[in-house]
Design a protein with these regions (language model features):
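Alpha/beta-hydrolase superfamily serine-hydrolase fold, recognizing
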Residues: 1-190
């Protein structure tokens, strides 16, 4: 597993992810792209770039509390913010601006929900009700379905950002669902 997320500017993170993807793809083994938060947005942008380059697609995207639009356009984010124990709009918007670098924050490489979603791999999303990124993630799921993508959404109303990685009972269920989706995508244990 390799991780690259919001700690690197978009250009560096996406280029690093592309290099790793090409290297691993050359082996011919099935690939599942997974990311949490900014890493989920990066995985989505990578999948779109792979599609646009005509390269072999990943079998599935698994996106945990995905940050798919760094501008947080969904109006429900305002209502959720007081109940979100981890994220605030001001910080998220500033992180998005910094991550974008010289690109506009609306660019699909930065906010992949604004790009072409047709032809992307099947997706499994894990979305939390107490996460300001949740409304955009749910809207993205509907947009992806409308574009012809197969999308499964696991929604946890009382959970917060990154909940699937924590120690709650709901988290363990989410991790089991991630494992099942991964195994189904790659054809079981090799």
């Amino acid at each position: 597993a390799v991780s690259a997320g919001a700690r690197k500017p978009r250009a560096a993170a996406l280029e690093f992810a592309r290099q790793v993807y090409r290297r691993e793809s050359a082996h011919g083994a099935p690939i599942v792209l997974m990311g949490d938060s900014a890493g989920a947005g990066l995985a989505l942008a990578l999948a779109a770039g792979v599609r646009d380059a005509g390269e072999r697609a990943a079998r599935r995207l698994i996106l945990l509390t995905p940050w798919v639009d760094v501008e947080l356009p969904h109006p429900d984010a305002h209502a959720i913010e007081p109940t979100d124990p981890m994220l605030g709009r001001v910080g998220v918007l500033e992180a998005g601006r910094l991550y974008a670098g010289a690109l506009p924050t609306s660019h699909p490489a930065i906010s992949p929900a604004r790009g072409n979603l047709q032809g992307l791999p099947a997706m499994t999303l894990f979305v939390a009700g107490r996460d300001i990124l949740g409304p955009d993630a749910l809207a993205f799921a509907e947009q992806a379905r409308s574009s012809g993508c197969a999308v499964d959404v696991h929604f946890a109303q009382d959970m917060m950002h990154a909940w699937a990685l924590l120690g709650f009972a709901e988290s363990r269920k989410a991790r089991a669902a991630m494992a099942a989706a991964t195994l189904a995508a790659i054809g079981g244990l090799q």
